[in-house]
Amino acid sequence: MTADLLPVRRALLSVSDKTGLVELATALAARGVELLSTGGTAKAIRDAGLAVKDVADVTGFPEMMDGRVKTLHPMVHGGLLGRSGLDDAVMAEHGIGAIDLLVLNLYPFESVTAKADCSLADAVENIDIGGPAMLRSAAKNFARVAVATDPSQYAELLASLEANNGQLTAATRFAFSVAAFNRVAQYDAAISNYLSAVTATDTAVPVRAEYPAQMNSTFVKVMDLRYGENPHQSGAFYRDLYPVPGTLATFQQLQGKELSYNNLADADAAWECVRQFDAPACVIVKHANPCGVAVGAGNGDAYELAYATDPTSAFGGIIAFNKPLDAATAKVILDRQFVEVLIAPDYEPAALEYAQKKANVRVLRIPHGDGLNNFDNKRVGSGLLLQSSDNRGMTRDELKVVSKLAPTDKQFTDLLFAWKVAKFVKSNAIVYAKDNRTIGVGAGQMSRVYSARIAGIKAADANLVVEGSVMASDAFFPFRDGIDAAAAAGIKAVIQPGGSMRDAEVIAAADEHGLAMVFTGVRHFRH
């Protein structure tokens, strides 16, 4: 049975990150807590004018082997592992004093090995041995011992001591124990991933494989979801341990119903697409496919143009902006259509106030960030597919004109716009665009020519004029039929990767129809 409240009389502090150390030690000393410490931590505490006992004086052994051995001793681990009422006699027999609180963070292995010029020797020297051992001992004995692993926990620790007259609750000790075991697992995973990636050690800086022989990943649960992709499936949302700034996992929900599995999948597609653009842009997504994308003079202009691409599909969609959302645009959207999720880097106060009239609409703020996801993964039966993220951009200078007719400057602008959109449309993907807006989108067809036909049908349904538009294809055209369909619809320029066995036939079709065509040399499959 675990006692609910236990006093803290003796604490061991040993940290590599000195953030908040002196303030914590001062607060503990003010409560009469005896402080034990090691090396640089003890020096920092002494320099603050506080009394502290060196662990070497407790163990009777000096720190040795350049600090590799200092806490691996029964006087330390016995003090952490000793059980009240069970081990009291043994501890008294051997003069082991109980340690009630351990404050410890580990050598900075992750940050050291993140440096491109990190040597294997530096990596190895930053593998903490005594630290994880103490964390495990203290965390295992949460019935009597509390353990803090990060400066972010110090405020909660001190608040709990203050609220309970120098004692810590069982709930606090257990929560800190779980955090400690999680930290040790993360640390060991980082070491395993690093060493598993090392393929050569005969150079000053070891050669590391992009994909380690064994991979360990850590994710933190953000929330449980009402259900998964379908109501009969359960679901939850987890984020990376260290989310990339500017990505979906950094969102703040400002209002609305609980987010669903599909909401989050669609929101990610919409946000990643819209954040490609520098000018004000709007992306409307349905079932993870953009159904309308536009760049405009402002949010309102971009939204109107994106919405006009496919008003039917926009119903119940996810709408994302790359600029702070103004009240006027928010009012137009919410008065016109049913929206599942609104996304923007920020909102005018009046926009949020108006959104409250539609309390079920989920409103997300995702702060701007320049970071990009490095890897994508997909689960398959008992396995994982891992790849580098498709972050490949494209500039005009990289395009190769393969037709007799070269695109005009305006067509080049539209081609690059359509190419950005096509990257986020499920394959086979065809995008018709003109004047920095989508005219029609053909997505997810098994035949590329059918995607081209669907893009034309979508444009006609929305009463949009295809004549003079450009077409983007996420992959090469295996036959000329896609070009024939595009020309019949009124397309005047085409951007595609090239690389088909029938490229000559496809180029000839473009020349026959008087189309300009450029190759990117880059494919954007999306499944």
UniProtKB/Swiss-Prot annotation:
Pathway: Purine metabolism; IMP biosynthesis via de novo pathway; 5-formamido-1-(5-phospho-D-ribosyl)imidazole-4-carboxamide from 5-amino-1-(5-phospho-D-ribosyl)imidazole-4-carboxamide (10-formyl THF route): step 1/1; Purine metabolism; IMP biosynthesis via de novo pathway; IMP from 5-formamido-1-(5-phospho-D-ribosyl)imidazole-4-carboxamide: step 1/1
Catalytic activity: (6R)-10-formyltetrahydrofolate + 5-amino-1-(5-phospho-beta-D-ribosyl)imidazole-4-carboxamide = 5-formamido-1-(5-phospho-D-ribosyl)imidazole-4-carboxamide + (6S)-5,6,7,8-tetrahydrofolate; IMP + H2O = 5-formamido-1-(5-phospho-D-ribosyl)imidazole-4-carboxamide
UniProt-listed Enzyme Commission number(s): 2.1.2.3, 3.5.4.10
BP-aspect Gene Ontology terms: 'de novo' IMP biosynthetic process
InterPro entries from the UniProt entry: AICAR_Tfase_dup_dom_sf, Cytidine_deaminase-like, MGS-like_dom, MGS-like_dom_sf, PurH-like
CC annotations in GO: cytosol
UniProt keyword annotations, A-Z: Hydrolase, Multifunctional enzyme, Purine biosynthesis, Transferase
Pfam families: AICARFT_IMPCHas, MGS
Molecular function terms, GO-annotated: IMP cyclohydrolase activity; phosphoribosylaminoimidazolecarboxamide formyltransferase activity
Residue span, MGS-like domain: 1-149
Domain observations: The IMP cyclohydrolase activity resides in the N-terminal region.
Family statement: Belongs to the PurH family.
Record's protein name: Bifunctional purine biosynthesis protein PurH
Organism: Stenotrophomonas maltophilia (strain R551-3)
This protein's encoding gene: purH
